[in-house]
Swiss-Prot record:
Superkingdom as given in the UniProt entry: Eukaryota
Name of this chain's protein: Provicilin
Source species of the chain: Pisum sativum
Family label: Belongs to the 7S seed storage protein family.
Cellular component GO terms, alphabetical: aleurone grain; vacuole
Signal peptide (UniProt feature, chain positions): 1-15
Low complexity composition bias: residue spans: 225-238
MF terms (GO), sorted A to Z: nutrient reservoir activity
Residue segments, region Disordered: 223-242, 312-331
Record's function text: Seed storage protein.
Subcellular location field: Vacuole, Aleurone grain; Vacuole
Length: 410
């Protein structure tokens, strides 16, 4: 504890509040893409719009999905790779391939990679709880921008098939265009009343795009043959894996820290990402630590707390300040403390090399997604175990710290 106090005291030259803190993204920084009475899809603002320190996150976007019981996200595909993590609730995810279909029953803590272009649909199979799902998207076409394509058209977005000419569609499906239009595409002309009522009903449920209500029987049909994540293995090449499938890497009476790294999972290795889940009990502290290579995007799923991050002055400035920053590079850099209150739905980013500490004012759960995960090391600056300062040799401690080496080791 002495080391932690000495370390923080030596860097608290100045501090920034939540509003000036570029590392915290409050829940109101999510933009709503789709919303109706059945649920919503929200997209967090671009990381690099907050600060130039996040330039390496330009091609990463964070989405949140939430839906009511017995609802379905209609089939679609996106030009981005995804890492999907279930924050709460139960759901059935179906992923389609040219000659295959895989369905998975997901629950809290499950994660899975969805390759770019995968056609998927997602059903809430929980009778009471509203599942929350987090997606880290990595676009493959244009950095930082992703585009979704629906198999079935809606009132606000046409099916991707509707973009083709009549001749191409007739040749592809080996039938006349009127039949294709009736079965697969939205009707454009007047129809008999019995068909119009079916269309009107379809447009009504699709009025706000992609989230629709389904029956209990339909949910059971979707989930009955679905596979579940393995609780004993994290090495699945394509199926879901659970963040708590192995023992925590850190654990004591104050909390638990679970983590799955690329070395343990092929899906994560493909994208060079790690995923972790951290439980911190009320009144407890995650000791000051930093990552050597990884940039970690953290979402608060439950509870409240405070986080402190040590950075350098002007890291809250955007790209328009680059010239001014270049002029200041040769001046002394002021070390600065950034503070923020944490609440459910908040997101914060921990750049590589930036020490951070988190205090829980109620039982706190965090989900982290680490970019540049390969060969990353987490270094603690305080504590009895894994404390990197304890590895400093005695003569160096005498020179580096104001206290004696004995006092530093205490």
């Amino acid at each position: 504890m002495l080391l932690a106090i000495a370390f923080l005291a030596s860097v608290c030259v100045s501090s920034r509040s939540d509003q000036e803190n570029p590392f915290i993204f409050k829940s109101n920084r999510f933009q709503t893409l789709y919303e109706n009475e059945n649920g919503h899809i929200r997209l967090l603002q671009k990381f690099d719009k907050r600060s130039k320190i996040f330039e390496n996150l330009q091609n990463y976007r964070l989405l949140e999905y939430k839906s009511k019981p017995h609802t379905l996200f209609l089939p679609q595909y996106t030009d981005a790779d995804f890492i999907l993590v279930v924050l709460s609730g139960k759901a059935t995810l179906t992923v389609l391939k040219s000659n295959d279909r895989n369905s998975f029953n997901l629950e809290r803590g499950d994660a899975i990679k969805l390759p770019a272009g995968s056609i998927a649909y997602f059903a809430n199979r929980d009778d009471n709880e509203e599942p929350r799902v987090l997606d880290l998207a990595i676009p493959v076409n244009k950095p930082g921008q992703l585009q979704s394509f629906l198999l079935s058209g809606t009132q606000n977005q046409k099916s991707s098939l509707s973009g083709f000419s009549k001749n191409i569609l007739e040749a592809a499906f080996n039938t006349n265009y009127e039949e294709i239009e009736k079965v697969l595409l939205e009707q454009q002309e007047q129809e008999p009343q019995h068909r119009r009522s079916l269309k009107d009903r379809r447009q009504e449920i699709n009025e706000e795009n992609v989230i629709v209500k389904v029956s209990r029987d339909q949910i059971e049909e979707l989930s009955k043959n679905a596979k579940s994540s393995s609780k004993k293995s994290v090495s699945s090449e394509s199926g879901p894996f659970n963040l708590r499938s192995r023992n925590p890497i850190y654990s004591n009476k104050f909390g638990k820290f679970f983590e799955i790294t690329p070395e343990k999972n092929q899906q994560l290795q493909d994208l060079d990402i790690f995923v972790n889940s951290v439980d911190i009990k009320v009144g407890s502290l995650l000791l000051p630590n930093y990552n050597s290579r990884a940039i970690v995007i953290v979402t608060v799923t439950e509870g409240k707390g405070d986080f402190e991050l040590v950075g350098q002055r002007n890291e809250n400035q955007g790209k328009e300040n680059d010239k001014e920053e270049e002029q200041e590079e040769e001046t002394s850099k002021q070390v600065q403390l950034y503070r923020a209150k944490l609440s459910p739905g908040d997101v914060f980013v921990i750049p590589a090399g930036h020490p951070v500490a988190i205090n829980a004012s109620s039982d706190l759960n965090l989900i982290g997604l680490g970019i540049n995960a390969e060969n990353n090391e987490r270094n603690f600056l305080a504590g009895e175990e894994d404390n990197v300062i304890s590895q400093v040799e005695r003569p160096v401690k005498e020179l580096a710290f104001p206290g004696s080496s004995h006092e530093v080791d205490r």
